[in-house]
Every structure is written in structure tokens, then in C-alpha cells.
């Protein structure tokens, strides 16, 4: 029974310190952000994952939680005669794909 109580208190403490929610990771009482890459990052500064074309940002909310925000490319949907144009190599958002449509022929 004591082991169960210890495990319950420990798991509750861990869940209060670290929570993963939609939109990012949250940490309490930290002055740096431990990003999803496992590295420490300064608050209120961007960092990038060029291989996966993502941008990250950490900030403190009104409750003192440090929140990691991840920004991905928008969904590119090509309809009709349009096509998906791959993004350039490099940082977000330049690496994101875009939709390219042919220009309509102008009547002479």
C-alpha cells in the first residue's frame, strides 16, 4: 500500500511539473525552455528544425508555465491545373511548399 501511495504522489508531482498538451510542451518554474529536441533554449527566441521545416518558440504564460510553440508549414492543396511547388532549402517558412497555378492567357 505504501508503494502505491509513493507512486501516486510521484506521478502527480511529475504531472504537475511537466504536461504535454495540444500546441506544445509546458514546464513550470524554469528560466530556459527545454525544447522537444532536448536542448535548452532562451525564452522569447525562435529556433529552427531545418530538416523538418519547423519553427519553435518558448514563452512564459500568465501562470509562469514555460510553453513551447511549434509552427509547421500550412497544408498546400493543389486544385485544377495548379501544382505543389517544393519549398527552398533552408529555414521555415522558405522551406514550405506552395501552390503554383498557371496564369490565365490574356486575350489579345
From Swiss-Prot:
Main location: secreted
Protein keywords: Disulfide bond, Secreted, Signal, Toxin
Post-translational modification: Contains 4 disulfide bonds.
Signal peptide (UniProt feature, chain positions): 1-19
A GO term from the CC aspect: extracellular region
Subcellular locations according to the entry: Secreted
Tissue specificity of this protein: Expressed by the venom gland.
Single GO term (MF): toxin activity
Pfam families xref list: SVWC
UniProt similarity note: Belongs to the scoloptoxin-16 family.
Name by which UniProt lists this protein: U-scoloptoxin(16)-Sm1a
Gene source species: Scolopendra morsitans
Amino acid at each position: 500500500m505504501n508503494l502505491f501511495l509513493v507512486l501516486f504522489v510521484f506521478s502527480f508531482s511529475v504531472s504537475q511539473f511537466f504536461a504535454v498538451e495540444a500546441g506544445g510542451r509546458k514546464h513550470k518554474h524554469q528560466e530556459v525552455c527545454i525544447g522537444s529536441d532536448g536542448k535548452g533554449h532562451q525564452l522569447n527566441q525562435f529556433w529552427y528544425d531545418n530538416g523538418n521545416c519547423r519553427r519553435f518558440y518558448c514563452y512564459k504564460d500568465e501562470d509562469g508555465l514555460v510553453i513551447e510553440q511549434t509552427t509547421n508549414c500550412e497544408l498546400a492543396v493543389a486544385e485544377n491545373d495548379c501544382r505543389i511547388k517544393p519549398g527552398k532549402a533552408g529555414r521555415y517558412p522558405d522551406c514550405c511548399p506552395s501552390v503554383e497555378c498557371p496564369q490565365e492567357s490574356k486575350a489579345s
